[in-house]
């Protein structure tokens, strides 16, 4: 079987490539000319440069190939301007799908890696309820809006295209850079949290996302959408407490600030990012993400229909991630 993975040099994409190789697939990694191949060193990997900003170029680049499976994991999570999210996440998906259709490529399955973020701050009344597939998305970030627009485009094609959408919650694990910043701060004995209202959060380890991807490729139902988490719900301090435990620090100062403090910090982070041309991790989208109180989601459909069973509870996943950060000189 021949598989194409977009975003192959990214956090999730690189793990998908590794699993495809493990399963003996002819594995093609779509990367940009400027992308790092640090985690794509296996000599069995075939590389292809795809220009997701041009449907015409995509057709030319894909024309010599017939892929059985395509996993679209490419996407922008931080951009200097909101419209850039749409160019990458929405238009990039649209152009890729159109190129596949115009070429008449007989793919068996197209898996789109979306996000729980497309739903925004819904079901925020306590006690919090799980976000379900029948809920109406109300994305509150440019990232979430762009991913939702990509989903809508896939839905508009209908049954003529064999797609499945995965909506993971916060994905963490070795190589991940955003949660790593929290670990860096805690190593310096500081844990910064915002908001005093209860916050229910969910996580999913990267290998569990990979598990779901290949289950979807194997026997998912066309047009279905699945939430992914480890099946548990945590309070906002759980992640930092586990990091602190694994780091073995003798003490940690937890600073909890009002939401308005975060608003000021992210405002200036966004401003400085645009001035310097390098987007800060603390930006306007991050403000809405950190402000959101309910990240519960219903993974029962993924378990029932895909056979998805998360193998990495938070304690195990954090232990593995921190060990990797230490072993690789990140911490």
Regions found by a protein language model. Give the residues of each.
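N-terminal Rossmann NAD(P)H-binding glycine-rich loop of SDR-like oxidoreductase domains
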Residues: 3-23
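Conserved Rossmann-fold NAD(P)-dependent oxidoreductase catalytic core, especially the SDR/UDP-sugar
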Residues: 94-142, 164
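Substrate-positioning beta->alpha
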Residues: 149-150, 176-181, 194-217, 223-224
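Amphipathic terminal alpha-helices
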Residues: 297-305, 309, 313-331
């Amino acid at each position: 079987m021949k598989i194409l993975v977009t975003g192959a040099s990214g956090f999730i994409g690189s793990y998908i490539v590794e699993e495809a190789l493990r399963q003996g697939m002819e594995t093609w990694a779509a990367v940009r000319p400027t992308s790092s191949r640090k985690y794509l060193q296996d000599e069995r990997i075939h590389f292809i440069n795809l220009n997701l900003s041009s449907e015409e170029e995509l057709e030319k680049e894909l024309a010599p190939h017939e892929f059985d499976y395509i996993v679209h994991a490419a996407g922008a999570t931080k951009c200097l301007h909101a419209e850039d999210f749409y160019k990458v996440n929405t238009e990039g998906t649209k152009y890729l799908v159109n190129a596949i259709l115009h070429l008449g490529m007989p793919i068996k399955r197209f898996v789109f890696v979306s996000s729980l973020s497309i739903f925004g701050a819904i079901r925020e009344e306590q006690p919090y309820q799980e976000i379900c597939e029948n809920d109406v998305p109300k994305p509150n970030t440019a990232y979430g809006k762009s991913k939702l627009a990509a989903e809508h485009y896939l839905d508009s094609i209908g049954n003529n295209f064999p797609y499945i959408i995965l909506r993971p919650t916060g994905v963490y694990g070795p190589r991940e850079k955003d949660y790593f910043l929290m670990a860096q701060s805690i190593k310096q004995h500081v844990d910064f949290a915002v908001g005093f209202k209860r916050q229910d959060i969910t996580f999913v380890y990267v290998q569990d996302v990979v598990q779901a991807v290949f289950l979807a490729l194997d026997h998912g139902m066309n047009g279905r959408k699945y939430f992914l988490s480890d099946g548990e719900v945590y309070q906002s301090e759980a992640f930092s407490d586990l990091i602190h435990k694994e780091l073995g620090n003798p003490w940690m100062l937890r600073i909890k600030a009002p939401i308005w403090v975060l608003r000021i910090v992210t405002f200036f982070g966004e401003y400085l990012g645009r001035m310097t041309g390098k987007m800060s991790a603390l930006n306007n989208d991050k403000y809405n993400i950190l402000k959101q109180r309910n990240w519960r989601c219903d993974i029962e459909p993924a378990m029932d229909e895909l056979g998805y069973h998360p193998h990495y509870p938070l304690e195990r996943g954090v232990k593995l991630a921190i060990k990797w950060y230490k072993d690789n000189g990140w911490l």
